[in-house]
């Protein structure tokens, strides 16, 4: 619970300011803005079931570990380019990572909560998580204008700082949590790319062909 609260605090150091960066500093059109924001939402919907199957197989913690290490790089990737095409690509990556993290964070809190006090435990988590989000936003809002600028923008510096803070939180706190369910041990590479082996791909194509013949 502590890890997720601090991770969301770190996430909200810069999360509320992506829209301001796009609209006030890059001056992109509202159509481009909607495209960038919708890309993440669509990607999340496409992969959330995929992540769920992997969480059932390898456990919530395994998926949390993978996705928690991916999320900090979302902020860092925003420093690479300000083109709409690049930012849409970053949002694809972001939607992929956040779909797994949010899904498994919620399921892990449910699994870890003592059954006799589950409602109280989850309510306390929600309250402290909301407090962490508020504190993170306040830190970002007050810190941003005082940071040195990268390419003429303090938003980019804020993204860099937030990405580093998120990495520190993951590396410092994640080791303190452990899986509460009995799950099989599986390598991260097998969890992510296991479906890309020839047998799995052949099965996938066979299912598509069978459905097309119905």
Task: Give each language-model segment a name.
Residues 16-32:
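Short amphipathic helix-loop junctions that connect adjacent transmembrane helices
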Residues 46-59, 144:
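Helix-to-loop junctions at the C-terminal end of transmembrane segments
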Residues 62-77, 163:
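Structural signature of the two symmetry-related core transmembrane helices
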Residues 77-91:
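Helix-loop junctions at membrane interfaces in 12-TM secondary transporters
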Residues 144-164:
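A membrane-interface helix-boundary motif in multi-pass transporters
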């Amino acid at each position: 619970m502590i890890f997720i609260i601090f991770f969301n605090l770190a996430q909200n150091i810069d999360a509320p300011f992506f829209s301001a960066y796009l609209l006030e500093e890059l001056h992109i059109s509202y159509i481009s803005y909607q495209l960038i924001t919708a890309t993440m939402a669509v990607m999340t919907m496409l992969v959330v079931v995929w992540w769920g199957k992997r969480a059932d197989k390898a456990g919530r913690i395994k998926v949390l570990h993978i996705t928690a290490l991916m999320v900090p790089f979302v902020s860092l990737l925003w420093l690479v380019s300000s083109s709409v095409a690049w930012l849409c690509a970053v949002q694809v990556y972001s939607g992929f990572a956040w779909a797994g993290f949010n899904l498994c964070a919620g399921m892990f809190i449910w699994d870890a909560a003592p059954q006799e006090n589950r409602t109280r435990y989850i309510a306390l988590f929600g309250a402290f998580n909301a407090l962490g989000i508020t504190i993170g936003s306040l830190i970002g809002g007050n810190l941003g204008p005082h940071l040195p600028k990268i390419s003429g923008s303090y938003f980019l510096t804020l993204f860099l700082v937030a990405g580093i803070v998120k990495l520190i939180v993951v590396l410092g706190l994640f080791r303190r949590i452990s899986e509460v369910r009995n799950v099989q041990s599986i390598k991260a590479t097998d969890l992510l790319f296991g479906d890309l082996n020839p047998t799995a791909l052949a099965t996938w194509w066979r299912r598509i062909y069978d459905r097309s013949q119905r």
